[in-house]
């Protein structure tokens, strides 16, 4: 085999091995099995929202595993195709192998981006808000164009979209819209879209056909996950027992059945004395403590989300321009990635921008 080709094939295989390691195929298979078991429950659809989330996560993770298996098979098949074509002197076979090698590189690069999503919230679903900014009716129309772009992107990947709110402008377009993309890693992927987007075109709303510049802001936040159960390590609590007391402080129990639990890391204290036994009072107190810790956790998450809103990727940062006139070009101002077909981009073909943005963000974090 040609040494350059052999080295290239080895690099492709090594890249795939790295992806398989980061994505942890054993853990991925275990998660799929867990979701399949959940999806098979007869009472699953009693909670429609939960059922839809389980179904979406199952489809997404099955797709991830299938992609990796397909890529592994393609790497192996490509090596065989090169060997057979070289042995038989088949030029058309070699040309086919070269073409497949180029495609395989591109597909591996796209999947490799997924391994860069390792932030605290990256694995979560996303809530996207789009608002018209400067530019009047053109800005409102642009906001609607952007919403369609993201919805089409989600549809291309078979990600469910749930629209929370749309506020329509008087003449055309949207004042604002908020929607949720129900797919794992939607936040990590779409968060690079946060910022101000700029549109330059001949305005369809201008009677004189003048060129107009308008702006729309995109905000991307992770979905706060509901937690049904809070684990409390035994080492994190101190349990004190005392006699139950009634009106006026008088003892109503001759045994020390009442329980007071102190959560050492937070200082939260709860007590229970209404149950008949110490074990029952402890169990009840633990349930109260779990509720208090869950409420505290959600308060902290809300504060963290507020901090994300004020992070560097703010609304005021112009990050992409969509030029429809006098030439046609969509260009990311951070990564320099550009596409000369705005129609395709506005129809949801934005994976190139997302991949470039994720790589750029990783470089910025490492700097």
Curated annotation (Swiss-Prot):
It is found in: Cytoplasm. InterPro entries: PCRF, Pep_chain_release_fac_I, Pep_chain_release_fac_I_sf, PrfB. The keyword Mitochondrion does not apply. GO terms for cellular component: cytoplasm. SUPFAM superfamilies: Release factor (SSF75620). GO terms for molecular function: translation release factor activity, codon specific. The modification N5-methylglutamine is found at residue 250. Keywords: Cytoplasm, Methylation, Protein biosynthesis. Methylated by PrmC. Methylation increases the termination efficiency of RF2. It comes from the Bacteria. SMART domains: PCRF (SM00937). Its main location: cytoplasm. Belongs to the prokaryotic/mitochondrial release factor family. Peptide chain release factor 2 directs the termination of translation in response to the peptide chain termination codons UGA and UAA. NCBIfam families: prfB. This is Peptide chain release factor 2. It comes from Saccharopolyspora erythraea (strain ATCC 11635 / DSM 40517 / JCM 4748 / NBRC 13426 / NCIMB 8594 / NRRL 2338).
């Amino acid at each position: 085999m040609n040494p350059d080709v052999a080295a290239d094939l080895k690099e492709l295989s090594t890249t795939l091995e790295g992806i398989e390691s980061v994505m942890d195929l054993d853990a991925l298979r275990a998660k799929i099995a867990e979701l399949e078991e959940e999806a098979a429950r007869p009472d699953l659809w009693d909670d429609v929202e939960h059922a839809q989330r389980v179904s979406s996560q199952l489809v997404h993770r099955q797709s991830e595993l299938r992609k990796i298996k397909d890529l592994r098979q393609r790497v192996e098949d490509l090596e065989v195709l090169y060997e057979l074509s070289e042995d038989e002197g088949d030029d058309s076979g070699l040309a086919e192998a070269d073409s497949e090698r180029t495609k395989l590189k591109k597909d591996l690069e796209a999947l490799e981006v997924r391994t860069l999503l390792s932030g605290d919230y990256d694995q979560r679903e996303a809530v996207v808000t789009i608002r018209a900014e400067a530019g009047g009716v053109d800005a409102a129309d642009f906001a609607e164009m952007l919403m369609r772009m993201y919805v089409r992107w989600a549809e291309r990947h078979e990600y469910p979209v749930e629209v929370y709110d749309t506020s329509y402008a008087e003449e055309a377009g949207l004042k604002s819209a908020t929607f949720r993309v129900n797919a794992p890693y939607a936040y990590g992927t779409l968060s690079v879209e946060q910022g101000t987007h700029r549109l330059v075109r001949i305005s369809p709303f201008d009677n004189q056909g003048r060129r107009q510049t308008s702006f729309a802001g995109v905000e991307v936040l992770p979905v706060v996950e509901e937690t049904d159960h809070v684990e409390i390590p035994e080492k994190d609590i101190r349990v004190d027992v005392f006699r139950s007391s009634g009106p006026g402080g008088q003892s109503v129990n001759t045994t020390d059945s009442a329980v007071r639990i102190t959560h050492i890391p937070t200082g939260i204290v709860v007590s229970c004395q209404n149950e008949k036994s110490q074990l029952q009072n402890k169990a009840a107190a633990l349930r109260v403590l779990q509720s208090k810790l869950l409420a505290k956790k959600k308060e902290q998450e809300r504060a963290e989300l507020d901090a994300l809103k004020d992070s560097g990727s703010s609304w005021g940062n112009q990050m992409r321009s969509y030029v429809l006139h006098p030439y046609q070009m969509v260009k990311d101002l951070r990564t320099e990635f550009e596409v000369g077909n705005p129609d395709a981009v506005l129809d949801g073909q934005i994976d190139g921008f997302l991949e470039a943005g994720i790589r750029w963000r990783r470089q910025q974090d490492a700097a």
